[in-house]
From Swiss-Prot:
Keyword Protein biosynthesis in annotation: yes
tr-type G domain sequence ranges: 104-273
InterPro entries reported for this sequence: EF-G-like_DII, IF2_II, IF2_N, P-loop_NTPase, Small_GTP-bd, T_Tr_GTP-bd_dom, TF_IF2_bacterial-like, TIF_IF2
Function: One of the essential components for the initiation of protein synthesis. Protects formylmethionyl-tRNA from spontaneous hydrolysis and promotes its binding to the 30S ribosomal subunits. Also involved in the hydrolysis of GTP during the formation of the 70S ribosomal complex.
UniProt name for this protein: Translation initiation factor IF-2
Gene: infB
Length: 601
């Protein structure tokens, strides 16, 4: 019995992929994605359902929207469903007017992978074949991104292949790419930078598509690549997983159309939308200083529309858009979502990954920049780093915590031994997530990944260079090197212990009898007391007993011996106790206690 891919059937029947998945869900048919295959009898059932709904199957694909974006299920059904009769309309409850749906936007794609696996060659082939000849001939400057026109619409490619650029942008809190294409050479399979690229894409939580390049070579072995991917828990669809794997050749063009088709399908499922009428916001892709023109910055528009004449603020820098150039080198007056543009107008070159916003005028731009400068100066002067609360560091209480790790070792054997130990160290409360494990010294790319994923870098028998250590210090990343395996294990134990929900018990410190109440104009009532047992300590927990009843629970905010502030007072001495509570009375008993963390096995 023949099988057919879901997206192929949707295309042949002229329906939206989302509609097709909706029907399959109703039939209880299992699938991984729109590229999964279904049986012929299921195809017949789908056709019957569509006919009952009044849809006429078409041998030709449904026409693409003018914008090139995939239609939403609601739009598709509105176009395909028969018009209701007056009787049917009268029987329905009056529906509230639907909220304005945001239009779809083009996907933004980044290409990553190991050096020499063909990232740039693949981009060059796509640019050569998917950018109109007259436009391609007009490209005079590199703007960091380009638009490819396909049968499914526009796809934007970030033209700076490599995970370093991708993660540099993410490290500043910006997400630009919607989809990551991991390029792997069919004759080389997984290499260190391949694993790094995969780790970066996973940390960014963007959908991944694997392009197995160089399949035209005689020594190409795509099956080995697929098998190797399963070792990273990335299972190709044909093996029963959900990873899309596409064999391609950047040299001959084989499979490139399929790759673009899969990118469009993934984007459709992600349902990417943006409001061109909203407030403008974007991200700096790259910037440079041109000797003649001045500062040129490539901006990826994410929301709203950017116009010539707009005032922009990025970091502590602002400027007015004097001119804009699209990815084909042409002058434009405005740019909507998912459009990369080169902007002329900044006085200083902004950094990759910085967020860009628009303001009404120059006065507003100056005010916003001044506010940001003041905020930074206050932070610098105070030299205070905001300490994370226990819940921020460890997640909500009662949930499993995840400790992200990056491992570097001198040999593959050492790596495997360490990973085996880590697997045995996991507990119900703490999960150890090795984001990246590689042979050799840590890199600045590791530090970038650690900064975006809040990871710790552990090195065994390898040392970090001065520049990597400096980068780790600047980003406040824990980077530790070990020569003895047991020391590394001790560090892992420390990390686990630091992520286990602490258990505290209350232990008594001492008791005091209130013998007189002293009225103080600033501090309120002070309890003149005599310590009968143990000791009282400043900042200790306190409760006040009046007879057998507890009348107050709080903290000892201050202790005095005569006129001196003291930290604690032992039994047999008098003192003044400030409870920040004015109802204390003679004869009350103050009991002090402290919370002590209980050691856990």
């Amino acid at each position: 019995m023949s099988k057919v891919r879901i997206y192929t059937l949707a295309k042949d029947l002229g329906v939206d992929n989302a509609k097709m998945l909706e029907i399959l869900d109703g039939l209880g048919v299992a699938y991984k994605s729109v590229s999964s295959t279904i049986e012929e009898d299921t195809v017949e059932l789908i056709k019957q359902i569509l006919e009952e709904e009044g849809h006429t199957a078409s041998a030709e694909p449904a026409p693409a929207q003018a914008s090139g974006s995939p239609a939403s299920p609601a739009q598709t059904e509105a176009q395909e469903a028969p018009q209701p009769t007056a009787t049917a309309t009268a029987e329905r409850e009056p529906a509230a007017p639907p909220a304005r749906e945001l239009p779809h936007r083009a996907p933004v794609v980044t290409i990553m992978g190991h050096v020499d696996h063909g990232k740039t060659s693949l981009l060059d082939y796509i640019r050569k074949t998917k950018v109109a000849a007259k436009e391609a001939g007009g490209i005079t400057q590199h703007v960091g991104a380009f638009e490819a026109k396909t049968s499914k619409g526009k796809i934007v490619f970030i033209d700076t292949p490599g995970h370093e650029a991708f993660t540099t942008i993410r490290a500043r809190g910006a997400n630009v790419a919607d989809i990551a294409v991991i390029v792997i050479a069919a004759d080389d399979s997984l290499m260190p930078q391949t694993r790094e690229a995969i780790a970066h894409a996973q940390a960014a939580k963007v959908p991944m598509i694997v392009a197995i390049n160089k399949v035209d070579l005689p020594q190409a072995d795509p099956e080995k690549v697929k098998t190797d991917l399963t070792q990273l828990n990335l299972v190709p669809e044909e093996y029963g997983g959900d990873l899309i794997v596409v064999p391609v050749s950047a040299k001959t063009g084989e499979g490139v159309e399929d790759l673009l088709e899969y990118i469009s399908l993934t984007a459709e499922l992600e349902d990417l939308r943006a409001d061109p009428q909203g407030e403008f916001s974007g991200v700096i892709i790259e910037s440079r200083v041109d000797r003649q023109a001045g500062v040129l910055a490539t901006v990826m528009v994410q929301e709203g529309t950017l116009h010539v004449g707009d005032f922009l603020v990025v970091g502590e820098n602002y400027g007015k858009v004097k001119a804009m150039t699209d990815s084909n080198g042409g002058r434009i007056k405005e740019a909507g979502p998912s459009t990369p543009v080169q902007v002329l107008g900044f006085s200083e070159a902004p950094s990759s990954g910085e967020k860009v916003v628009s303001v009404k005028n120059e006065h507003a731009a100056r005010e916003l920049v001044a506010q940001r400068v003041e905020t930074r100066r206050e932070a610098e002067n105070a030299r205070v780093q905001r300490k994370k609360t226990l819940e921020e560091m460890m997640g909500p209480l009662g949930e499993t915590r995840t400790v992200n790790l990056i491992l570097r070792a001198d040999t593959q054997g050492s790596l495997e031994a360490i990973q085996g130990i880590l697997a045995r160290k996991e507990t119900e409360d703490v999960k150890l997530n090795v984001m990246l494990a590689g042979i050799g010294s840590p890199t600045e790319g590791d530090v970038l990944l650690a900064s975006t994923a809040d990871a710790t870098i552990l090195c065994f028998n390898v040392t970090a260079s001065g520049s990597v250590k400096k980068a780790a210090e600047q980003r406040d990343i824990e980077l530790k090197s070990f020569r003895i395996i047991y020391e590394l294990i001790d560090e892992v134990d420390r990390l686990i212990k630091g992520n286990v929900e602490p258990v505290f018990e209350e232990r008594p410190l001492g008791r005091a009898e209130v013998r007189m109440v002293i009225r103080h104009p600033k501090s309120g009532n002070i309890a003149g007391s005599y310590v009968t047992d143990g000791l009282l300590r400043r900042n200790a927990k306190a409760r006040v007993l009046r007879g057998k009843q507890v009348v107050y629970e709080g903290t000892i905010v201050g202790l005095k011996r005569f006129k001196d502030d003291v930290r604690e007072v032992q039994a047999g001495y008098e003192c003044g106790v400030n409870l920040d509570w004015n109802d204390v009375q003679e004869g009350d008993i103050i009991e002090a206690s402290e919370l002590v963390e209980v050691a856990q096995a």
